[in-house]
Amino acid sequence: FAPQIIKNCMISIDGLAVEFGGTALFSDISFVINEKDRIALMGKNGAGKSTLLKILAGARQPTRGKVSAPKDCVVAYLPQHLMTEDGRTVFGETAQAFSHLHEMEAQIEKLNKELETRTDYESDSYMALIEEVSSLSEKFYSIDATNYEEDVEKALLGLGFTRGDFQRQTSDFSGGWRMRIELAKLLLQKPDVLLLDEPTNHLDIESIQWLEDFLINNGKAVIVISHDRKFVDNITT
């Protein structure tokens, strides 16, 4: 869940170029990603779509050009090939999407305990600590974390899992099903910009329809690579 804090997460792409051994994969690509934009990258295999997505995710550097985004802009990336970690249940692994909330809560508790032991009420450091607790608490309570288990359940059911699957180990599932777990985690984090590389590859029709509805109603920017023309048409129009 993203904090309900108003911010402008516009990303500017300026003059991107990627070359391999003097051969240009693409050059002089410039565009802007605005809040709530839903953009599809389409083209033949080898055109550089996945490479562009990796650059936007910060996973690789271009030969030339730059990507500019606000510091607090959260970008999440689902690559085409990815494996989930073993050692957790399907539900437990998906709930890792909210692990930052537990860390935030622990930090607030730690700072509050420190405040209780301080007596230098007029000092700059005390005021700075008060400000830090206030800011962190505001951010934490602006996130509706109370129903996160319900949201995990909805995402897993939407992506084709059954309730009987929730307590099974992730290692019981094939790569395609494990990719669904990673997709669920990414969606539940509600980043400002979602980068999805062929997200429908391992999904059935019902799960694709659920994903379409989620992306349309999510209200966040999405950039997707997909050969599924119907999916692209549905989410970008």
What are these regions (language model features)?
Residues 3-237:
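ABC ATP-binding cassette signature C-motif
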